[in-house]
Amino acid sequence: HDLALQYIVDANGADETAEKEGKLLRDAWIEHPDHCLLKALVAERAIFFVLLPFFRFNGDPALRTVAADISRDEQIHVGCNTLVCHELGLSASPSLDKLRKATINWVLQPLGTNTYDKYLDKKFWLDASDRLMYEGKAPEFSDTKAARMPAFFEHANTNLPQYA
């Protein structure tokens, strides 16, 4: 997934300041003392499960396709990690929750209040992250099942599956 996302970054460019901030957040996740499975669960459920629908609603064809591919894997990861963390009696510390909030706010920083399209409203996505963190579900994402997937004509022929 990292490689596919990096191709998208390479094609669209990256903001140098945002990259520096992202690396600081990455390091904070790595250094955080909570159990690694718990950190993975929080990142997947309350960050990735927010960003992937965001990418499917607001991304270009490449980003929508990659987000759909990643979503399938993340569903399995979250299910497994939820069970393991429950069996081990692990729960997120307040400092891990603060790190989650800092991370999702960093990613959604360019968004603001949007009164005509909820999928461009920062609060919509932040609220979903909170609900996923505390309740494990985000009913406001029921529409994401209908998010538009790229059609064959939106990709170069070289990027289409070959069956022969």
What is each of the regions a protein language model found here?
Residues H1-A164:
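Non-heme di-metal
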